[in-house]
Structures are given as C-alpha cells and as structure tokens.
Amino acid sequence: MKELVSLAESAARAAGAILRSYFQQEYTITHKGLDDPVTNADTEADAFLKEKLLSACPDYGWLSEESADSAERLTKSRVWIVDPLDGTKEFIAGRPEFMVSIGLAENGQPVLGVLYNPINDELFSAYKGQGAFLNGSRISCTQTKTLSEARLIVSRSELIENLWQPYRHFFKTLQPCGSVAYKLALVASGKADIHISLKPKNEWDICAAHCLL
C-alpha cells in the first residue's frame, strides 16, 4: 500500500502542476449541466491521471468526475476514484480553494486517499489504519466537544444562498470554503472542527478525504 500512496502522491503533484499552469490564466469553460462548469484544466489533469494511474495498475477500475463511466469498474476489486479538480468554481473565481483528489476503494471501501492543493502546496495523504499526514507530518482532528465552540466549515454557495442562516447560532464560527475535499482535509488537519453539507455528494467528492478522517 505504501507504493500506491507514493504513486498517488506523485500523480497528484504532477496533476497539480497542470492546474497551477492554468490558474488565473486563460482556459476554456464549458458546462456539463446547470451550474456545473468544467474547464480544459479539469480535462487535461483527468487525462493525465488516468494514464498515470492505470498504466501503473492496469487491473484496477476507474471512476472520475471528468471521464465517461464504465460498468467494467464494478467487476474490479480495486477502483481509483478521482476528481482531477475538486472546486472548479473556486478555480474559475481565482480562489486557491481547490484540490486534486485521488482515492482508492477496495471491495467498495475507501482504503487510500491523497489530496493536493497546488497553490498552497498542501499534500494530504492517508491509507487505512496508518493515520493521516500533511506534507509528511502527522495530522489529527480537533478535540472540540461542543457545537458552541465548533468552527464549522461550509460551502460558500450555501452561505450565499442563506441556507445556514437558521443554524448560525449553534456554532462558534461559520467559515466558507470551496471544494468538498479541501473542507474535509481542513477538518482532518484540525483547521476546522466540522464540515456539514446540505447538498448531496458523489463518490469522487469524498472517497480520498474519507481516508484522512
């Protein structure tokens, strides 16, 4: 498993370099659906990760936000679950709140996670039973016991839509942040106490970060 962590870390850094080369520069934006943008930075990083990870692990399955899904992955015991750019809206807005997210599931359970913020050079990694790390240093969640002392980190769009207005008084602070993966990584490293989402998520949003927690 250590070899797979090293592979995923190397892939995440290289994909992050692709994203960094486009950040606050020129790129194309298309829309997969309502309020669901995708850039050529997303697709280029996705193509790189698919080639890098599957060439090293040809017997593994593949599930990515930016790749066409295939039922063949359901026949595989191990599946890479990837979001090449988690936080596309933040990327487009010029905010450094986005991640390369690489998870590995074994028999349907997350066992490895690597997340990389290429602007802040934050590399989060974990594999099952071995703890979580940020740039090589062990990290852990806070020991906050009560909601009144908790720093809640939430989606910026949910704050803008005032979805949290009825619940603000329960928490010490509400901090906006893009990227589900980044929010969970910040909780795992003790920089926030709780993340709650009021909207549904996909496997590629949470698989890698699940391992950090």
Segments from the language model and where they lie:
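Generic detector of well-ordered alpha-helical packing
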Residues: 43, 47, 66, 84-87, ...
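Short loop/edge segments at beta-strand edges and connector loops
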Residues: 64-66, 136, 178
